[in-house]
């Protein structure tokens, strides 16, 4: 069982983030398995909430340092808005620094306002997620990987991504339906599926 941060009841869109570490430590002492944060680059008033405010990678490092063994997860990294090299290095760093604790959800994002801000096409987000996941696995599993695509060019034997994850891979849990990617694709390409809370009758149909 996991907890989505922040642990707080608040009015409006922006939490105060008061005493979060103490609350997370309490959650760990009660036997919860994990705490999760979200990847929300921009505050959009139309969505009326901003998650835990802080950058997910930095905040998870902060949490992991001040806890003992509770798992730390992102639900989920908005892959189309991030470069695979940055995601690969950040995720692998958490995996190595806090062994067997980091979990990574991946998503296409659901806030159209973010895409023009990053100069990314919203309508291509499902393709971007698929390409991004494949590239992450290459960057994690191979020494001196190469690529020549929309993300840029990395020639043979000129650069490597370090550190590598402990098992040369990090499971990726696909969130939602990723902008049109269906369940068959998720079953084939993802390591798990994270979905939004829904009524039981809806979940049963899935």
Briefly describe each language-model feature range.
Residues 1-206:
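Active-site-adjacent structural elements that line small-molecule/cofactor binding pockets in enzymes
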